[in-house]
From Swiss-Prot:
Cellular component, GO annotation: ciliary base; cilium; cytoplasm; nucleus
SUPFAM superfamilies: Protein kinase-like (PK-like) (SSF56112)
Effect on the protein of changing T159A: Loss of activity
GO molecular function: ATP binding; cyclin-dependent protein serine/threonine kinase activity; metal ion binding; protein serine kinase activity
Annotated spans, Disordered: 311-344
UniProt subcellular location: Cytoplasm; Cell projection, Cilium; Nucleus
Gene behind this protein: Mok
Function as written in the Swiss-Prot or TrEMBL entry: Able to phosphorylate several exogenous substrates and to undergo autophosphorylation. Negatively regulates cilium length in a cAMP and mTORC1 signaling-dependent manner.
InterPro entries, alphabetized: Kinase-like_dom_sf, MAP_kinase, Prot_kinase_dom, Protein_kinase_ATP_BS, Ser/Thr_kinase_AS
Alphabetized UniProt keyword annotations: ATP-binding, Cell projection, Cytoplasm, Kinase, Magnesium, Metal-binding, Nucleotide-binding, Nucleus, Phosphoprotein, Serine/threonine-protein kinase, Transferase
Annotated binding of ATP, by residue: I10, G11, E12, G13, T14, F15, S16, E17, V18, K33
Enzyme kind, highest EC tier: transferase
Annotated protein name in UniProt: MAPK/MAK/MRK overlapping kinase
Provenance organism: Mus musculus (Mouse)
Xref: Pfam families: Pkinase
Length: 420
């Protein structure tokens, strides 16, 4: 840590201590997560789930950025140098007399769902989504503290006592570790309500009280749902029937779309609970999606000025010349003939082994038939493989091609589904 100067303590948890540090190299401020665990080797450090997750998920605008990993072999100490944010969600809402505006709530929740979607698409679920682990800096929200994360493909059962009790999903409370990434959406729903109302949704004092608080609000589940929870604990599933009072409307300024998304995120049955990618398409985020699309369009015009000169309507009104239509019909005929001949054999690409510096070697390509025209001798020239040397030289065959170039209008190729 010789390259950093300690400024002050930010917070402390069970497994780590977070300090505000200043880099002596660039002068910038960072958050240093000093691990309390002793590490024996660099292999043990690299196998740490939090480091693996941050490396896989970065860069992303809503995932806390990992700047550097500092490991001292002699002392066995490990520190994660991350970007410094202003505060976490708990600090943001603590002591507030009035809730945030719905516009601000919508902005934060959209970014939280973006972070969850990115994480789940990359095969990771967090398992400890709570206000303390969600960081903000002005209008930017980032998810941090991946110390409890797991792979969505790892074998169940998982650790039973995971995530903070107030944000723990029913399947985590009622099973011996049989839960999925959908638990993150339940936790995010609880955070959603807390940001909007400044009050926790299910503040249970113990596990039994926690499940009771859930039933008080959303009611007891049907037997079909309970049978999905495998390997139940000693806790009895003979719950007295409760209809549920419904989610308390402590704030009158919440829109129907807001409440609709909130109910979808805290669905009792994880199979019926909304996923992160589905939440991003919810009507509640319509304004955010429109703003995001507009921003992307501005960036494209800034980086590709020629696109801004083309009228928008022309992008959907493609016209072909008469010669182009003929070539397109010819191309379709050739493709149909090729399909009748049977599928071509596919070659599997060799797997890359990246270790240190990777050397790239060139290989010769097979001879290709020219599409430029015939040579001086009346025969179709063949382009032979070129070997890279200090000076590129043209072959005699290539020299013959140049004065006899023939121009062709190549047909436009239609891409299915807009893929490139």
């Amino acid at each position: 840590m010789k390259n950093y100067k300690a400024i002050g303590k930010i917070g402390e948890g069970t497994f780590s201590e977070v300090m505000k540090m200043q880099s002596l190299r660039d002068g910038n401020y960072y958050a240093c997560k000093q691990m309390k665990q002793h590490f024996e080797s660099i292999e043990q450090v690299n196998s740490l789930r939090e480091i693996q997750a941050l490396r896989r998920l970065n860069p992303h605008p809503n995932i806390l950025a990992l700047h550097e990993v500092v490991f001292d072999r002699k002392s066995g100490s490990l520190a994660l140098i991350c970007e410094l944010m202003d505060m976490n969600i708990y600090e943001l809402i603590r002591g507030r007399r009035h809730p945030l505006s719905e516009k601000k709530i919508m902005l934060y929740m959209y970014q939280l769902c973006k972070s969850l979607d990115h994480m789940h698409r990359n095969g990771i679920f967090h398992r400890d989504v709570k206000p303390e682990n969600i960081l903000v800096k002005q209008d930017v929200l980032k998810l941090g503290d991946f110390g409890s994360c797991r792979s969505v493909y790892s074998k169940q059962p998982y650790t039973e006592y995971i995530s903070t009790r107030w944000y723990r999903a029913p399947e985590c409370l009622l099973t011996d570790g049989f839960y999925t990434y959908k638990m993150d959406l339940w936790s995010a729903g609880c955070v959603f309500y807390e940001i909007a109302s400044l009050q926790p949704l299910f503040p249970g004092v113990n596990e039994l009280d926690q499940i009771s608080k859930i039933h008080d609000v959303i009611g007891t589940p049907c037997q079909k749902t309970l049978t999905k929870f495998k390997q139940s604990r000693a806790m009895s599933f003979d719950f007295p029937f409760k209809k549920g009072s419904g989610i308390p409307l402590l704030t009158a300024n919440l829109s129907p779309q807001c409440l609709s998304l909130l109910h979808a995120m805290v669905a009792y049955d994880p199979d019926e609970r909304i996923a992160a990618h589905q939440a991003l398409q919810h009507p509640y985020f319509q304004v955010q999606r429109a703003a995001e699309t507009q921003t992307l369009a501005k960036h494209r015009r800034a980086f590709c000025p020629k696109f801004s000169m083309v009228p928008e309507s022309s992008s959907h009104n493609w016209s072909f010349s008469q010669e182009g239509r003929k070539q397109k019909q010819s191309l379709r005929h050739e493709e149909g003939h090729a399909r009748r001949q049977g599928p071509t054999s596919l070659m599997e690409l060799p797997k890359l082994r990246l270790s240190g510096m990777t050397k790239l070697s060139s290989c010769s390509s097979p001879a290709l038939r020219s599409v430029l025209g015939t040579g001086a001798n009346g025969k179709v020239p063949v382009l032979r493989p070129l070997k890279c040397a200090a000076v590129n030289k043209k072959t005699d065959t290539q020299k013959d091609i140049k004065p006899h170039l023939k121009h062709y209008h190549l047909p436009t190729i239609n891409r299915k589904g807009g893929e490139y």
